Amino acid sequence: MKGLMCAKYDDLVGNLQQAHGEARKWWAINSHNELVELFVNNENGAWTIIITRSNDPISCALIGGDNSGANYDIDSTVEMKQ
């Protein structure tokens, strides 16, 4: 995952929570057995998607944005089967 913002899972999630006010709103396991998560700040609409490999303690922020305008008052999970 070269060129991405990567850190230990707890450090990356802690930064999203503390510095950006984002909380996990959705997660899924993809076909490569990687954890994909969406973090959202409900006040300003900022969001970040991170990915974590099952065999690696490092997580990477794939993409993020501001003012999405969507309602993230959800708590859903999806597990994709191989």
Predicted regions span which residues?
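Polybasic/polar functional segments that serve as interface/processing modules
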Residues: 1-82
